[in-house]
A protein has these predicted regions:
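Glycoside hydrolase catalytic-domain context in secreted enzymes
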Residues: 1-230
């Protein structure tokens, strides 16, 4: 096409993309066909720029009006959140080689202190509110990736929770894609935290597939843990 011909032999420094409405505005439409068309726009531009994985959509619950990323999330309603994320995923993944990353799994509903926060959630609230949207999206659209969250959940780092990753996400929801950490999750330690740092070997043991962005230290830690286990 014209764009491809114009860019042939050129190094792209800036990716000019179509601006679509924020997540909350999309959800207010209650129109999954429209949201899927927005995903189609994203997928088309991903193809054009050679982008294979989109680090979105995010479907955490609007629990507090003080959460600085509420604009990125869809709703306080897990049904709406799941349906919107599924529609967006279908639109993007209709394009060959393009995938979405739904996040942040799970119970990441505030920005302040989120690397040290321990979300205490009952089983009922977890099932009815905080996991439901993820289950809907996985079952209806099978996103290519799921990103775990920075926070702890009932005392366990989400990336280290085999219950969340293997028992619920994979076995119960039927998820088939990759599970990645949020950025530098195994290295987000803080001396002010009452909890230990998330550790790479425990993330791997829980079923995590990809450390982002990863480094040699993480690889060394996992290899040593594997050798010790043998």
């Amino acid at each position: 096409d014209v764009c491809s011909s114009y860019l042939a032999g050129c190094e792209i420094k800036t990716q000019y993309c179509t601006a679509i409405p924020i997540g909350t505005a999309l959800a207010q439409s209650f129109d999954t066909d429209f949201v899927q068309r927005c995903g189609d726009i994203v997928g088309e531009e991903m193809e054009h720029f050679g982008v294979h994985l989109w680090l979105a959509p995010a479907l955490n619950i609007h629990r507090s009006i003080r959460c600085g990323r509420n604009f990125e999330y869809y709703s306080e309603d897990p049904l709406v959140s799941g349906k919107m994320a599924a529609a967006m995923t279908r639109g993007v993944q209709a394009h060959k080689g393009c995938g979405t990353t739904i996040k942040h799994y799970a119970a990441n509903n505030k920005e302040y202190n989120r690397t040290r926060n321990n979300s205490m959630v009952s089983e009922r609230a977890m099932r009815e509110i905080y996991l439901k949207g993820f289950g809907i999206c996985v079952r209806e659209a099978q996103p290519k990736a799921v990103m775990t969250s920075y926070n702890l959940l009932n005392g366990t780092h989400t990336a280290e929770s085999r219950g969340l990753v293997m028992d619920i996400l994979r076995a119960e929801f039927g998820y088939q894609g990759i599970v990645m950490t949020d950025w530098v999750t195994p290295m987000t330690g803080d001396a002010r935290s009452a909890h230990r740092d998330s550790q790479a070997q425990y993330v791997a043991a829980a079923g995590g597939d990809l450390f982002m962005p990863g480094n040699k230290g993480i690889m060394t830690t996992c290899c040593r843990a594997s050798t010790a286990a043998q």
